[in-house]
């Protein structure tokens, strides 16, 4: 939002410089991103009057002008602008002057003719071509009103001004208007805010005699109103109004359109003006668009509408796309005489979806998306009527034609001075606090120690007590919050909690395994919200998301980790190994808080070990990813088991559930080839664990085991089994019959192919035996080995 200091002073009187004002506003929570000074780098710029114009004797495209610049004699200026003519008041840069871009004005000769100055266009004095009236796009600027030659041109243009650029957070939509900003500034300086004139001299003729309004979708359009103004004269708007629009980043068009945009900036209430005679009927019907319905918008583009779009119609044909853009045949033209002014409240979500789908973002749609102040809807329309009467010679019909309900102008919130003081450490009296609320334009009611604050609708960011406390702190001054030392009943030495200690251990293990920690957004698109979810539960969707990509709370960490991996690979960082510990969210019943669960996830793609001069290249595979997960289990003194599984988004043959005490706590697997290809990834492996579940079981420490004093033995066994039998089933059988001397097992070879029956595979397993109390004998080991082999044969294995 661009805030003109000259315009702001119309509502609130302050003596501070603009830089001091900007500093004060920033300190209270609205960041002033930039200060734009329209006088910067400009010197000796005056108003000139072109007394005569003659063709240059030696150049067809140049003119020799005699220009009165308020000095004793006119000066001669050679000008090449196609629209220069005698009798014009123009902008002149005098000799010795300076223009933006370091341009210095000197005496010169152009094709033999003396030139003592420069007649300027708006571009040449620093105005962006995007905001210049179309009539002056390719020539010099010509004043539409008489001026005094020699006076300061920037003053005559209302450009001797500084503009603050606000970087607003979404919750402060009230500051998207001059009046909203004026309320804020008045509160900071404890001064009064003056609102603009809105009262018109009305005709006896009623707007109700010429128009009816019907809303067919009040759930999407709670309120719609219209007023009628007759006999307007279409002409350029006053210079001061054009200047304010230019400084706000809007191109002036004509007085009627400019008044609509002016009130939008003034009140933050979007208006739309229809040519009453072009509407085609005496009724306005607001409804949802019909499927496949089409309309041509003001940009001469035919739009195909959806049933989610809101349209304004003449009873049959759409004449405007609500809150986004008007229709072409009802737009205000040079021949327009009678105006219908629309003021309405539209559903923010519907407007956002329509504007984004059609790529029609505008000043109006952005304000509707954030929600508008009900208190200003009718007032803004009345203000437009007053301005049309004053600057377009319009005749305002009495009465307002409306349908629906505006809704509450205020929201009452109860609070006490004690609550405020305890929260922010102030010692303010009840009167001090009431004064601050009154400074902000909030009415109050007092009942003993309870202050009922009547929050106006323009401040949609204030809904709870804590919001009121923040307002008191902002206006009183964050810098004035007293410094106090904390008081503790009991002082204890600091240390990590058990949870913090375990989390730190896991991070160290993963970092030691070569993974880097990532931190990603908790918000994902609605499509990704349930991707890889271990609990198929309802998602938590935001009511007013900033974008479709951040519309829901995640149920898995993997969607964003996949995005991060894809982002890195696209930038030639092809070996990606990442992990994240973060929260996921699951909805409960209506009115209940959601479940918030901490997860641990990882993603690996590319080479795990780079092929350098002293190392062998090792590409990421399933077993390497499983080894990373096993390191986590070992560090937490847990024992995972794995079970084959089918999980959406993962390779059907290379995916397993991770079990802890026979309960599923996670999964591991290769990203499905289609999903990997969609993200420009090669073979990629992921894992996800319910970290809360691990923490609930983990002891967090490993008992010390002395180094064995007696030697162990190893036996290898090769088994031929059906290819569908998982190795994990065989290992379970081995451990079940291995007694207390079988310490661990290792699958070191799997073979399928020649010399084996179709549908069979060979698995080689190493069994490690150890007795910590005595030396093992061959007979003892052979006996256990025989029991194991018998159990395996019973399971269907063939000993090779």
From Swiss-Prot:
Catalytic reactions of this protein: tRNA(Phe) + L-phenylalanine + ATP = L-phenylalanyl-tRNA(Phe) + AMP + diphosphate + H(+)
Q: Which domain of life is it from?
A: Bacteria
| TM region(s), chain numbering | none
Supply the EC number(s). 6.1.1.20
Q: What keyword terms does UniProt attach to this protein?
A: Aminoacyl-tRNA synthetase, ATP-binding, Cytoplasm, Ligase, Magnesium, Metal-binding, Nucleotide-binding, Protein biosynthesis, RNA-binding, tRNA-binding
Residue ranges of domain tRNA-binding in the record: 39-154
Sequence ranges assigned to domain B5 in this UniProt record? 408-483
Molecular function terms, GO-annotated: ATP binding; catalytic activity, acting on a protein; magnesium ion binding; phenylalanine-tRNA ligase activity; transferase activity; tRNA binding
Using the record's annotation, list all stretches that form the FDX-ACB domain. Answer: 708-800
Tell where it localizes. Answer: Cytoplasm
Per the UniProt entry, what are the Gene Ontology biological process annotations, in alphabetical order? phenylalanyl-tRNA aminoacylation
Family (UniProt): Belongs to the phenylalanyl-tRNA synthetase beta subunit family. Type 1 subfamily.
Q: Which NCBIfam families does the entry mention?
A: pheT_bact, YtpR
The molecule here is called Phenylalanine--tRNA ligase beta subunit
> In which organism is this protein found?
Staphylococcus aureus
Gene symbol here is pheT
